[in-house]
Amino acid sequence: MTRLVVIGSGAMGLAAAWEAAHAGHDVTLLEAGNVAGGMAAHFDFDGLSIERFYHFICTTDFATFKLLGELGIADSLRWRATTMGHFSGGRLHEWGNPVALLRYPGMSLWARLRYGVVEFVSTRRDRWDALETQSAREWITRWGGTEVYDKMWKPLFDLKFYDYADPISAAWIWTRVKRIGRSRKSLFEEKLGYLEGGSETLVTALADGFAKAGGKLRLSTPALRVETEGGRVTGVVTPEGTIAADAVISTMPTPLVAKLVPDLPEDWKARYDAIANIGVCCLIFKLGRSVTPHFWVNITEPGVPVPGIIEFSNLRPVGGNTPGGDTIVYVPYYMPVTHEKFGWSDD
């Protein structure tokens, strides 16, 4: 039996701890905050329980289906027909199907057809290997052309990746387009899923299953340092003392790893430090009426500093479909850690 410490109780940490506990290991899960779940945790938004960050499920998320079944919550999965929009030229356009693409006035007909080629190639491709060494700009330009990249992708990349927009991997954009592109009921109808009760349903099931398997969840207990001896983990230091450990799984952001494990070889520290990170500040609005009929709206309008909005209640009903009910809209604002706003306080 391995004494394992998992650091971070977001969905990844919870799932790793749950798997390890069910495999018979002695697992302690550390969480710096006072609730488990990370970005999947819910909070009370003026009487409404809602997740900190939006989540959705696609029809090809087979590992998720397997996990839901093992947790006994597969019956909480719901599917809904959703749509996309695109805001540009001061107008909201339909998006996400062949007819909408052909009707879109913001590109030449040839560019619209080539945009469709990028989408088609992405949804049909099964392997990412050859894309790992290509930038998204190179790949999209090769298949879609300069007009497609400059008008449709570059504005989104600039707002999401800033200085990293140009070298971002083609494998990233392919994975994203493929996942959404294959989650369809038909060529003309997108189909996305959610959990009844929100992501809290998954968080609660993982935490309860972890505890029943003998796991120990310690909230408000940050990991301060991973101790090693002879190149092997011996424990994790917390404000309450040291927890003996034979192995550690960290789900903390990679820039924190070198500080967390001071005995790491210098070349490993350099590898972790070299990984660029981008943060996100996600605003959540609770409104009395719907903003658009769409779940997701991409924005390529000059002067608008966000790449899109997510009208979450158009996927998971939270009162937005009833008269006088609530509409929940997430507005993500991305920024690299070098951005001046990244250093602002939460207040």
Task: For each feature predicted by the language model, list its residue ranges.
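Dinucleotide-binding Rossmann-like beta1-alpha1 core, especially the glycine-rich loop
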Residues: 46-130, 135-138, 142, 155
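Short loop/edge segments at beta-strand edges and connector loops
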Residues: 8, 79-81, 219-221
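Glycine-rich FAD pyrophosphate-binding loop
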Residues: 21-45
